[in-house]
């Protein structure tokens, strides 16, 4: 059986992570229910809206299987809301998986409507970049 990276795909930017894995020819599977967790060898908890992501804990089966896999030691990446899910101390009191020994402040750099796109010039090259609010 081929092992794959599991990408939590309940909400958020899971498709962008899949595109990155495709670039390096890494097998992946989207985790949408607890059965999808069985055959993964690494895990990505993507960014998105952290309040929505935290709701995975309402589904104890997914929550417990994710915790078991992470506690077994599989490599795990959390970006933005995924980091919030992993942290053991969220300053605004939101519940998390409590795996990573860190303190996180949600929306520390502003709210959703504080995100913007802007032109940046570096080494005489100008490109459009997206600036998003993020946890700290």
Predicted regions and their residues:
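Active-site oxyanion/phosphate-handling segment shared across diverse enzymes
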Residues: 120-136
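A conserved hydrophobic position in a structured secondary element of the catalytic/binding core
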Residues: 45, 78-79, 132
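Conserved beta-strand scaffold positions in the cores of enzyme catalytic domains, especially
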Residues: 28-30, 99, 129-131
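N-terminal beta1-alpha1 cap of cysteine-dependent amidohydrolase-like domains
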Residues: 1-59, 64-74, 121, 126
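Short, structured patches in soluble enzyme cores that scaffold and shape functional sites
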Residues: 9, 101, 117, 133-134
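Cysteine-nucleophile active-site neighborhood
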Residues: 50-120
């Amino acid at each position: 059986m081929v092992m794959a990276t599991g990408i939590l795909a309940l909400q958020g930017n899971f498709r962008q992570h899949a595109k990155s894995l495709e670039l390096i020819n890494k097998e992946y599977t989207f985790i949408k229910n607890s059965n999808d967790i069985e055959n993964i060898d690494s895990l990505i908890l993507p960014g998105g809206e952290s309040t929505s992501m935290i709701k995975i804990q309402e589904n104890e089966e997914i929550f417990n299987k994710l915790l078991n896999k992470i506690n077994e030691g599989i490599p795990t990446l959390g970006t933005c809301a995924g980091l919030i899910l992993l942290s053991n101390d969220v300053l605004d009191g939101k519940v998390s998986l409590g795996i990573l020994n860190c303190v996180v402040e949600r929306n520390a750099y502003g709210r959703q409507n504080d995100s913007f796109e802007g032109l940046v010039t570096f080494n005489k090259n100008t490109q459009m970049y997206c600036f998003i609010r993020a946890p700290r």
